[in-house]
A protein has these predicted regions:
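Conserved N-terminal subdomain of the carbohydrate kinase-like
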Residues: 1-44
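Glycine-rich, flexible loop/turn motifs
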Residues: 10-11, 20, 69, 75-76, ...
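Short gly/ser/thr-rich secondary-structure transition/capping motifs
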Residues: 18-27, 79-85, 185
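Acidic, amphipathic alpha-helical patches
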Residues: 29-30, 90, 120, 160
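Structural alpha-helical scaffold elements that stabilize or flank donor/cofactor-binding regions
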Residues: 32-33, 92-93, 125
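Conserved beta-alpha-beta core of the PfkB/ribokinase-like small-molecule kinase fold
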Residues: 39, 44-122, 130, 139-140
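Conserved phosphate-binding/catalytic region of the ribokinase-like
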Residues: 60, 114-214
C-alpha cells in the first residue's frame, strides 16, 4: 500500500510473506530467461534473506554467460522482520553486481550513517570491477567506480506531481542508455557514462512532473 507523507513523498506499508512473486526456484527462473539476455536487473523487495538461495545461483550462472548484473537497493522498512538479516542479504547481493544504485535514504535505512561516499567505497571494495550510482535527492547524483566519480545536478521539473517511481525511472533510463552505448563497464568512454547519468536525471524530472510513476 502506498501513502504520501506531508511533503508529498511516497510512504509504504508492505505485506511480503507468502506472496506470488517470491514463489520461484532458481531453475525455473533460469529456464524462462531469454538466451540472448544482456542484463539481469533485480532489487528492492527481492533483496530479502529467503531469496538468497534463489537469486545468487541465478546471478552466478548468468555472470558465467557474460550477462551484466544490475541491483537497485531501494531499501524499504518493514520488508523483513529481522532487519539485520535484511541488511546482510542486501550486502551479499551488492557484492555480486556489476552496477548498483543506492540512495542516501537507502543508506540510512540499512544503518549506514555518515558520509555516503565512504559507504559507496565499501560497496565497490566488495564488488568485482563494479560501479555504483549514488543518488542524493536535491543534491543530484554521482556515478562512481575506482576509476571515476561523475557528478550530475538534478533537473528541476516545471511542475511537481510527486516522486513516486522517480528512482526507478532514473535508473532504468540510465541503464538503457548505457546498454545502447555499449558502456556498462568501468573502462567505457566517460563522456558516454556521463551522458547516461544525465539521461537518467532528465527522465526522473519528467516523472516528477506528473502524479504517479510514468
Amino acid at each position: 500500500l502506498v501513502y504520501k507523507d506531508e511533503q508529498g513523498n511516497p510512504d509504504y506499508r508492505l505485506y511480503r510473506k507468502a506472496v506470488a512473486d517470491l514463489d520461484v526456484s532458481a531453475g525455473k527462473l533460469l529456464n524462462i530467461l531469454p538466451k540472448d539476455l544482456e542484463l539481469f536487473h533485480t532489487g528492492s523487495l527481492a533483496l530479502v534473506p529467503e531469496m538468497l538461495d534463489v537469486l545468487i545461483p541465478v546471478i552466478t550462472e548468468l555472470k558465467s554467460r557474460g550477462v551484466k548484473i544490475s541491483i537497485d537497493v531501494n531499501a524499504r522498512k518493514g520488508v523483513e522482520v529481522n532487519h539485520q538479516k535484511y541488511i546482510e542479504a542486501i550486502a551479499k547481493f551488492v557484492a555480486c553486481a556489476d552496477i548498483v544504485k543506492v540512495s542516501d535514504e537507502d543508506l540510512l535505512i540499512t544503518n549506514l550513517y555518515g558520509d555516503p561516499n565512504t559507504h559507496v567505497q565499501s560497496m565497490l571494495n566488495s564488488m568485482e570491477n563494479g560501479m555504483v550510482v549514488l543518488t542524493l535527492g536535491e543534491a543530484g547524483s554521482h556515478f562512481i567506480s575506482p576509476k571515476f566519480n561523475i557528478q550530475q545536478d538534478i533537473y528541476k521539473a516545471k511542475s511537481y506531481g510527486d516522486t513516486v517511481g522517480a528512482g526507478d525511472t532514473f535508473f532504468s533510463a540510465m541503464i538503457a542508455q548505457l546498454l545502447r552505448d555499449d558502456a556498462l563497464y568501468q573502462e567505457a568512454d566517460q563522456e558516454k557514462l556521463g551522458y547516461a547519468l544525465k539521461f537518467g536525471s532528465l527522465a526522473a524530472a519528467i516523472n516528477v512532473a506528473k502524479v504517479g510513476c510514468h
